[in-house]
Amino acid sequence: MAAKQLIFDESARHALLRGVEKLSKAVKCTLGPAGRNVILDKKFGSPTITKDGVTVAKEVELEDPWENMGAQLVKEVASKTSDVAGDGTTTATVLAESIYKEGLKNVTAGANPMDLKRGVDKAVQAVVKQLKEISHIVKGKEEIKQVATVSANWDTSIGEIIADALDKVGKDGTVTVEEAKHIETTLEVVEGMQFDRGYISPYFVTNAEELEAVLENAYILIHEKKISNLKDLLPLLEKIAKAGRPLLIIAEDVEGEALATLVVNKLRGTLQVCAVKAPGFGDRRKAMLEDIAILTGGRCLTEDLGIKLENVQLEDLGRAKRIIVEKENTTIIEGSGSRSEIQGRINQIRRQIEETTSDYDREKLQERLAKLAGGVAVIHVGAATETELKEKKARVEDALHATRAAVEEGIVPGGGVALLRCQKAIEGLSLKGDEQIGANIVYKALEYPLKTLADNAGLEGSVIVNEVKAKKGNEGFDVAKRSYVDMFEAGIVDPTKVTRTALENAASIAGLLLTTEAMVTEIPEKEKKPATPAGAGGMGDMEY
């Protein structure tokens, strides 16, 4: 095991501070409508230009190992805040730097770091409680648009599109963000349930121009296994032909004589039919087939039920008003399933989402929930250049996450006003000694987001903070218009969840940094001088 180097006490804490300050300086310049861009060098391709705090933070690696530890810990504040709330990464970084910097001054002056941390934690609890009390529930499309606009760095077009998307698919619907092939940013809403499987054979196509098969008022056969034997399928096909309605077959696969018969009957016009492979794999496939069965009012024919294909009745089939099958996607619109059964399935999936510990499983469950509950909206982000496209897509994703957070926990006045108004909660605490000093550190830190917003706009931050403190309620400073306004009326709002998460994460890491007493890292290897090549000696008389 290689030898390690250690540093202790003040040396350790000040090394951490240098790293925290360097990271914070790079990140906090992006805060607010007057925030600046940061250019990130990439080993391949053109540099990335961004105003997204967490994107900047993730790129920072410092040469000094002690300083780098501080930077990496604050980077975690930004990443965790982004993961949980989708935004507020820059605010979290500013708060972490402020709490640690002020706390370190007091530790250096002789305060007990453990008592300071307890004071910080108690102050944060009081502020979080106050934030929830001043929070407003998001009502209507206009307020959703305001939140999205603020989170997208004041881009009203992005705010409008996100508000439209959430309005159309509802709070349980899925909104995905994709890169467009043109320069405009557009919204596409997929009605009904869509899954990523297309027709097995192109002979099933009914619309040659669009290369799609459209089935109106169709029956749906949902089968877990492969269908290859015609004998098993024939009784059902005869019943379908008598009923005179189209049929969609969803199975693991359709092959051999079964597929040939379906194609021949489709081409002759005897039967309007289309076959697609079942979506997903393994247990997830079975769950998705059950979802389709419940949505369409049919039965999923699995081995567990013991129903043979030749014994299937028309009552066992699902039904839908319209089905569109493309080369790679199938969309089922207006399934005939019972509303109560669909709601029961939705509640079951919600419980699974709460219980799961896997991010991947949670994402897949949320997709299933969206397909059953509200549908799927796709925002196609367009831009003139690839560099702009990357930056814009990151802003859209941030704004979308923040908007969902706002719908979840409500909104508070933006522009740093909510945190400033929560100073009253700390004034109401009765603490003693170093715990009171810890609470005072948080009290002062709550001014920093507003101060940074004003500093980025080229104004005197301390003056703006004092002006806003003298005002009441939701009144604050509109940095873009350089005037004092009611933040709610001006549409300058932040999701409560974003503000809460930023403060909690910042205080958590700052508290850990304050109570650090020693640091350990590997000794950097010294570069070895290259060995003299063999036979290089004795060449002194040679001329060059």
Swiss-Prot record:
Top-level class of the enzyme under EC nomenclature: isomerase
Superkingdom, natural source: Bacteria
Region listing for Disordered, in residue ranges: 524-544
Question: Which GO molecular-function terms appear in the entry?
Answer: ATP binding; ATP-dependent protein folding chaperone; isomerase activity; unfolded protein binding
Q: Does the keyword Chaperone apply?
A: yes
| Binding positions (ATP) | 30-33, 51, 87-91, 415, 478-480, 494
* Catalytic activity from the UniProt record: ATP + H2O + a folded polypeptide = ADP + phosphate + an unfolded polypeptide
The protein's location, in the record's own words, is: Cytoplasm
* EC number from the UniProt entry: 5.6.1.7
Pfam (any one): Cpn60_TCP1
Q: Which UniProt keywords apply?
A: ATP-binding, Chaperone, Cytoplasm, Isomerase, Nucleotide-binding
Compositionally biased intervals (Gly residues): 535-544
Q: How does it assemble?
A: Forms a cylinder of 14 subunits composed of two heptameric rings stacked back-to-back. Interacts with the co-chaperonin GroES.
HAMAP family this protein is in?
Answer: CH60 (MF_00600)
Family the UniProt entry places it in: Belongs to the chaperonin (HSP60) family.
Know the name of this protein? Chaperonin GroEL
Which source organism does the UniProt entry give? Methylacidiphilum infernorum (isolate V4) (Methylokorus infernorum (strain V4))
